Structures are given as C-alpha cells and as structure tokens.
A protein has these predicted regions:
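Hydrophobic/aromatic beta-strand patches that form the interior of the parallel beta-sheet core
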Residues: 40, 64, 167-169, 186, ...
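Conserved acidic, metal-coordinating active-site core of Asp-based
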Residues: 87-182, 186, 190, 196-198
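Active-site phosphate-binding/coordination module
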Residues: 18-104
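Asp-based, Mg2+/Mn2+-dependent phosphohydrolase catalytic module
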Residues: 1, 181, 186-238
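Asp-based phosphoryl-transfer active-site loop
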Residues: 2-19, 179
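Hydrophobic "anchor" residues on beta-strands that sit immediately upstream
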Residues: 6-8, 62, 167, 196
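Short, well-ordered beta-strand core segments
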Residues: 7, 32, 63, 185-187, ...
Length: 238
C-alpha cells in the first residue's frame, strides 16, 4: 500500500527558480501524477502573479494560492475563498504611506519586506487584526489564522486525503507550518537554515533539481529508504 499519496510543492525557490519551472522539474511532477498520486501547488502568489510566469496549472490537482487564502481546482475552473478578505480600508492607507508595489489578491495583500514596519504601523493605526507572514524578501498580509497549513488542510479535505498521506516540500519561512503539518516535511537544499533544521528530509540538490530528487525517492519506495536512514530531523536525501 502506498503511504504517501500526495505531494504538496511550494513554488518560488522550490519547483521554480526566479519564476521559471525547468522542463526536468515539470517532467518529474508529471511522473507523480502518472503514478496515481495527487499534486498540490502551494504558493503565496496571487493567481495573477502566478499566471505571468507559470501556465501549467493542469499538472496539479489543486492550487493553494495567496498563502492559504484561495483554493483552486484547475480542471474544473472553480475556486473557493477560504477566508474573509483583508479589510478594504488597508489598501488606500498603505499606498498613501508609500507601500508600493502592493500586490492585491482575492483575500490578501503582498509587498516588499522593506515596508514591514510601515505595514505594521498602518495595521495598528487602523485597529485591524491581521497576520503578517515574511517569505524571504516579501511579506504577505492576511487574515488571522490563514497559512499554508490551513490551505493545504482544505485542499486535502477536498480531494479526500489526509495530512499523514502528504509529503510537503518548501524552502522559506511561510512553508514551515505546511512542512510540520504534513506526514513528511522536506526542505530543498537552498532552503533557509531554519527550514532545513526542522524538516524530516533535506534534498541534496537545490530548488527544482531537489524536487526531482524527491520525486525519485517517492516513486522508488515511498521514501522508505530515506526515512529509515534519517532517524531524525534534517537527514539528506540520497
């Protein structure tokens, strides 16, 4: 019996490098689908931001966008907001205070991390209760309790799967909840040290090459050999 039936992948810094998914990485993901397993794409990007760099949504069973706020079924062309949107009062005030560029999604906003203190002050001045999630050089502004974990949980429920059956792979701070939630959390070699420190496995190769490496292990023996060797956090894939 297959233990890990779902692979949940972060986008930037994981399957993609500077917004580009290499053909070899895409081929590896297609192998996962052909094996009968399910694929989730999990990203802080809005739909518009993702569309500008990556059009192969059909490879995935579900997309978790906006850091867990929006769930998309690409085959059916349907989407569900998983939370109430951030207050509309915030956008004009952020722009008035010079927070540009400001990406506006269905439920969240995103900006450069250099604006972090201004964003915090603005939220406080408006009396709003929101979460801020830093992702390397960006910050996502989102409703309380929304994360990649909550988004993946919704996606798994929608496809009739469980966290125990899921392998999640990522590289940055906003991936931490998802990796902890999954049955097996994997960090790519280029991931932040804090991510690699808590991952069950760490790939030997970076980004998309590391994902292809992970796929090889997943399809070979359901990661049994890698997890047997691991015996603890952060063991390297072979």
């Amino acid at each position: 019996m297959v233990r890990f039936r779902v692979l949940a992948c972060d986008f930037d810094g994981t399957i993609a490098t500077e917004g580009v998914v290499a053909p070899a990485t895409l081929a590896a993901l297609e192998r996962v689908r052909r094996s009968g397993r399910r694929l989730l794409l999990v990203t802080g990007r809005t739909a518009a931001q993702l569309e500008t760099v990556f059009g192969r949504w059909d490879v995935f069973d579900r997309l978790v966008l906006e850091n867990g706020a929006l769930l998309v079924d690409p085959s059916a062309g349907t989407e569900w907001l998983l939370c109430a949107p951030v207050s509309s009062r915030l956008k004009p005030e952020l722009r008035r205070r010079g927070v540009e560029p400001l990406a506006v999604g269905r439920a969240v906003y995103a900006a450069s991390v250099r604006h972090l203190e201004v964003i915090r002050e603005t939220i406080r001045d408006l009396g709003l209760s929101l979460d801020l999630v830093v992702n390397r050089d960006g910050v996502v502004i989102l409703p309380r309790g929304v994360s990649k974990l909550s988004g993946v949980a919704a996606a798994l429920f929608d496809i009739g799967e469980t966290a125990a059956a899921c392998v999640a792979v990522g590289d940055a701070e906003n991936d931490l909840p998802m990796l902890a939630f999954a049955g097996c959390g994997v960090a790519v070699a280029n991931g932040l040290d804090e991510v690699k420190a808590v991952a069950d496995l760490v790939t030997c190769r970076p980004a998309g090459e590391g994902v292809a490496e992970l796929v090889n292990g997943l399809l070979a023996d359901d990661l049994a050999a890698e997890l047997a060797i691991a015996g603890g956090m952060g063991a390297a894939l072979h």
